[in-house]
Amino acid sequence: MGTPELKIILEFSAGAELLFGNIKRRELVLDGNQKWTIANLLKWMHANILTERPELFLQGDTVRPGILVLINDTDWELLGELDYELQPNDNVLFISTLHGG
């Protein structure tokens, strides 16, 4: 048997995609041997796919205020935020509410 995999979908909307190479949807296959929380995922995203101005997406170890996070269409605040443990086929959507004027 091969290494266990954790497949999830990341989506970016309302300008958040501009920080990730202008790609609105990514299907990820993560190492299923480790526990993946949103906190781990954010660190992975910063190291691997965040291409532009990380200060507009991250503040410390979390997303900055103004970035909404939905996990399977549910506000992450209802699911434990950074401590939420990712499950197979989870859909994680990041929506930017930060807009210049």
Swiss-Prot record:
Post-translational events: C-terminal thiocarboxylation occurs in 2 steps, it is first acyl-adenylated (-COAMP) via the hesA/moeB/thiF part of the MOCS3 homolog, then thiocarboxylated (-COSH) via the rhodanese domain of the MOCS3 homolog.
Cellular component terms (Gene Ontology): cytosol
Annotated pathway: tRNA modification; 5-methoxycarbonylmethyl-2-thiouridine-tRNA biosynthesis
Subcellular localization, as worded in the UniProt entry: Cytoplasm
SUPFAM superfamilies for the chain: MoaD/ThiS
Keywords, ordered alphabetically: Cytoplasm, Isopeptide bond, tRNA processing, Ubl conjugation pathway
InterPro entries registered for this protein in UniProt: Beta-grasp_dom_sf (IPR012675), Mopterin_synth/thiamin_S_b (IPR016155), Urm1 (IPR015221)
Record-listed cross-link Glycyl lysine isopeptide (Gly-Lys) (interchain with K-? in acceptor proteins), residues: G101
Protein function: Acts as a sulfur carrier required for 2-thiolation of mcm(5)S(2)U at tRNA wobble positions of cytosolic tRNA(Lys), tRNA(Glu) and tRNA(Gln). Serves as sulfur donor in tRNA 2-thiolation reaction by being thiocarboxylated (-COSH) at its C-terminus by MOCS3. The sulfur is then transferred to tRNA to form 2-thiolation of mcm(5)S(2)U. Also acts as a ubiquitin-like protein (UBL) that is covalently conjugated via an isopeptide bond to lysine residues of target proteins such as Prx2/Jafrac1, Ciao1, Eip71CD and GILT1.
Family named by the database record: Belongs to the URM1 family.
Protein name in UniProt: Ubiquitin-related modifier 1 homolog
Recorded name of the encoding gene: Urm1
